């Protein structure tokens, strides 16, 4: 198990990194805008100086070509950048292209069930982000979703990692 921080706040990232337990970071332009603004690329590069592991950076485009262009640009910033692509038909297409043709690691995000995670795995995702807090908020069992996804990864021989994301309270991490 690895612990990632979801933030663009440099002080939060610095404090978390100091604990010695953080292995990566996930972030997006909205988090950066609410954490002091400035150039998103510069913010990501500063985070990369604080974190030794991967940093997942989310695209804002909604169409496949826009996502692809942003993903390629983000991947040029540093070899540790993992591109966050939202779960959608366009997102799956882009994931397949990035992982298969461009050798760019992808974190498919905003997933609410194991079927979505399975599709992301089949598209070649390096990471699948299941929104645990939101799954629980909807009245479903996030633990079962995580177990089903882990089982599919094991049985299918995938090397992808699961990110249990969108933790909203203590109950989400028990």
Where are these regions (language model features)?
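Catalytic alpha/beta core domains of metabolic enzymes, predominantly
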Residues: 92, 105-107, 112-174
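Active-site beta->alpha loop and helix N-cap motifs at the rims of alpha/beta catalytic domains
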Residues: 1-14, 19-22, 27-101, 132
